[in-house]
From Swiss-Prot:
The active site is at residues 34, 254. The gene is alr. GO terms for cellular component: cytosol. Belongs to the alanine racemase family. The modification N6-(pyridoxal phosphate)lysine is found at residue 34. GO terms for biological process: D-alanine biosynthetic process. It catalyses: L-alanine = D-alanine. Pathway: Amino-acid biosynthesis; D-alanine biosynthesis; D-alanine from L-alanine: step 1/1. This is Alanine racemase. Its EC number is 5.1.1.1. Its cofactor is pyridoxal 5'-phosphate. HAMAP family: Ala_racemase (MF_01201).
Length: 358
């Protein structure tokens, strides 16, 4: 019996990708697999993501891992390259790059490369994190068109800051800014990530960039992915390693953060913050044991957490516990903890065993 394990349901991944295609039927899919495939395993997710057209990563190391693993589809560095020394690596491995600043532009202009690089010009349409400002757009376009190290035609992209907030006018403003700048351009364009492709159909351009929704987790606070017809790809599990009787008035765990108000049974589960389960999980955070939700009771330890099974519990050592995923959405757990499901799935540590289910 293993302790903590992340069961990765590859049929759920296939279902989610098919649903994305149905929602953006006229767009190519750039599947975002950064941060170790959102914690699901970079290479296994890439190999199982049948029917996508390209992959997006954040770091050049992630791109090289894809190439070393036999992935031949297009790969894009969403943040672009970090130094001029990266450029020969991009050429040698057929890796595409975003360009969002003058340092990257000048590095491309000054490089002596063996071939051109596919460039996505990243426009700051209103998020103000990365990208060239609208007033700089034409200068960048002209210089990139003139650069021998840049494959033509250029491609164009931007990123939303508030697409998960359906009442926020910023997203429509960003769409208008990006479309007005790039209208008439020869190259392909991309604007929508997960929230965009789900809620803002006008942002479904030549490419969409599904990230979190591909893994069956919602980008929206008010709806789970299952509410939207998507399936959780990850189910995080462990097992009960002890069932103990606790009397009313007795406290459990470090700092005595939880005190029982009744005689009850406590279940000890073999998972903790050393596995990536958040230490911040407060009393009451739900865990699924034998099909019912039971609350976390006491501070999460490095290797264990404790739950209140109830006075009449018939659970036994060895019974499975589900921390999130199947029948317990990660979004629900994240809300209790005061974080987002993105953080839950991406912070699992290496001692969590990855189990891939066809």
């Amino acid at each position: 019996m293993t302790a903590a394990a992340a069961q990765i349901d590859m049929s759920a991944l296939a279902h989610n990708l098919q649903k994305i295609k149905q929602q953006a039927p006229n767009s190519k899919l750039l599947a975002v697999v950064k941060a170790n495939g959102y914690g699901h395993g970079l290479l296994n997710i890439a190999k199982g993501a049948h029917g996508v057209d390209a992959f997006g990563v954040a770091r050049i190391e992630e791109a090289l891992q894809l190439r070393a693993g036999g992935i031949v589809k297009q790969v894009l560095l969403l943040e672009g390259f970090y130094s001029a020394g990266d450029l020969p690596i991009l050429v040698a491995n057929n890796i595409q790059t975003a360009v969002h600043c003058k340092e990257q532009l000048e590095a491309l202009e000054n490089a002596d490369l063996e071939g051109p690089v596919v460039v996505w010009l990243k426009v700051d349409s209103g998020m103000h994190r990365l990208g060239i400002r609208p007033e700089e757009y034409q200068e960048y376009v002209d210089r990139l068109h003139a650069c021998k190290n840049v494959a033509q035609p250029l491609r164009y992209m931007s990123h939303f800051g508030c697409a998960d907030e359906l009442d926020n006018p910023t997203t429509n403003e960003q769409i208008e800014t990006f479309m007005s700048l790039t209208d008439g351009c020869q190259g392909e364009r991309s604007l929508a990530a997960s929230a965009g492709l789900l809620a803002w159909p006008d942002s479904q351009l030549d490419w969409v960039r599904p990230g979190i929704i591909m893994y069956g987790v919602s980008p929206f606070s008010e709806k789970t992915a299952q509410d939207l017809g998507y399936l959780p790809t990850m189910t995080l599990t462990s097992h009960l390693i002890a069932v103990r009787e606790v009397k009313a008035g007795e406290s459990v765990g470090y700092g005595a953060m939880w005190t029982s108000e009744r005689d009850t049974k406590i279940g000890v589960i073999a998972i903790g913050y050393g596995d990536g389960y958040p230490i911040a999980a407060p009393n009451g955070t739900p865990v699924l044991v034998n099909g019912r939700k039971v609350p976390v009771a006491g501070r999460v330890s490095m290797d264990m957490l404790t739950v209140d099974l109830g006075p009449d519990a018939e659970d036994n050592v060895g019974d499975e516990a589900i921390l999130w995923g199947r029948d317990l959405p990660a979004e629900e757990v994240a809300e209790h903890i005061g974080t987002i499901a993105y953080e839950l799935v991406t912070k699992l540590t290496s001692r969590v065993q990855m189990q891939y289910i066809p």
